[in-house]
Each structure stands twice: as C-alpha cells, then as structure tokens.
Amino acid sequence: MAENNGNGSTGAADTGQRQRFQIAKMYLRDVSFEAPGAPEAFRDEWKPQMDVELGTRHQPLGENTYDVVLTITVTARNNERTAYLCEVKQGGVFRLEGFPEADMERVLGAYCPAQLFPFAREAINDLVVKGGFPQLLLAPVNFESLYQQQKQRREQGTSDSAPSGSPDNGGRQ
C-alpha cells in the first residue's frame, strides 16, 4: 500500500502502480519591486491600469522529482505613468510517481502552478503594500484552462509559428 502523508493523493494508474503527488518544498526563488512613480504616484488619485503576466516552467531534478516555477509580473500604471512593477518567482519541488506520460505535462503545467499561486499572490500583495500602495488581491487563475490554451497553440504551431510572448511561456522553457 502506498503511503499518503497528507501532502499528496494516491489512486490507481493504468499500469497498476499507484499515483503519488507530493509537495517536497515551496520556496521564493526571486522577487523584485520597483516604484519608479514614487513619491509622485501617492499624490494622484489611484485609478490604476493593471497588467498581469503569468509564466511557468518546469525541469526534472531527479527520478520522479521536478522543479516548477511560477512567475507573476504585475505592472501598475496610473495617469499613464508606471507606478510600480512587481515580479515574484515562486518555486516548488514536487514528487510525482505513477502518472502516465500523457498526464505528466498537465500535472506539471497546470496542477503544480495552481499549488504555487496562493504563495505568489500573497508575496505580491505584501510587496505592493510595503511599497506604500493599496493592497492587490489577484483574482484566482484557472491554470487548467491556460494549459489547454497553450497546448492548442503549440499543436497549431507545428504548421505555423506560435507567438513568442505567450502568457505562460509554453509551460516550459
């Protein structure tokens, strides 16, 4: 019987092997906050235009172990000036066993980033508030939908070139 210590789930795979998902480590890989509009931005009425970009990548670390990084970049413009730029790279080390190859890309490209998102969202909010700006609560993200859209773009890209600046960087770099 496979051990489940509360960090993952188990279930039967086609091969008869149990599936196992475990979060081994969450870590803040990189963080950046710039406020080129400060202190003038604090005098203006706050009606910002927000630009949020998401990116993911993953790489194997060893047998059944993967490093996944979610990058979120937020640019706030107020009165046509950049008030702040905030970027967080939230990383996680995941152990995956027993998943069919067809499911691995989906787990790494959608499920793992979804686990990282709450931590990245909190880090961004903390940085924005410490920068003197109103809190920023990013809306939930449907990573499964983003993954499917990127997968379709990649499949269509076999006959014509795919756009290079896609929001999730192809799920893999």
UniProtKB/Swiss-Prot annotation:
<dbReference type="GO" id="GO:0051082">
    <property type="term" value="F:unfolded protein binding"/>
</dbReference>
<comment type="function">
    <text>One of the proteins required for the normal export of preproteins out of the cell cytoplasm. It is a molecular chaperone that binds to a subset of precursor proteins, maintaining them in a translocation-competent state. It also specifically binds to its receptor SecA.</text>
</comment>
<protein>
    <recommendedName>
        <fullName>Protein-export protein SecB</fullName>
    </recommendedName>
</protein>
<comment type="similarity">
    <text>Belongs to the SecB family.</text>
</comment>
<dbReference type="GO" id="GO:0005737">
    <property type="term" value="C:cytoplasm"/>
</dbReference>
<comment type="subunit">
    <text>Homotetramer, a dimer of dimers. One homotetramer interacts with 1 SecA dimer.</text>
</comment>
<keyword id="KW-0811">Translocation</keyword>
<dbReference type="InterPro" id="IPR035958">
    <property type="entry name" value="SecB-like_sf"/>
</dbReference>
<dbReference type="GO" id="GO:0015031">
    <property type="term" value="P:protein transport"/>
</dbReference>
<keyword id="KW-0653">Protein transport</keyword>
<dbReference type="Pfam" id="PF02556">
    <property type="entry name" value="SecB"/>
</dbReference>
<keyword id="KW-0143">Chaperone</keyword>
<keyword id="KW-0963">Cytoplasm</keyword>
<dbReference type="GO" id="GO:0006457">
    <property type="term" value="P:protein folding"/>
</dbReference>
<feature type="compositionally biased region" description="Polar residues">
    <location>
        <begin position="158"/>
        <end position="167"/>
    </location>
</feature>
<keyword id="KW-0813">Transport</keyword>
<dbReference type="InterPro" id="IPR003708">
    <property type="entry name" value="SecB"/>
</dbReference>
<dbReference type="GO" id="GO:0051262">
    <property type="term" value="P:protein tetramerization"/>
</dbReference>
<feature type="region of interest" description="Disordered">
    <location>
        <begin position="148"/>
        <end position="173"/>
    </location>
</feature>
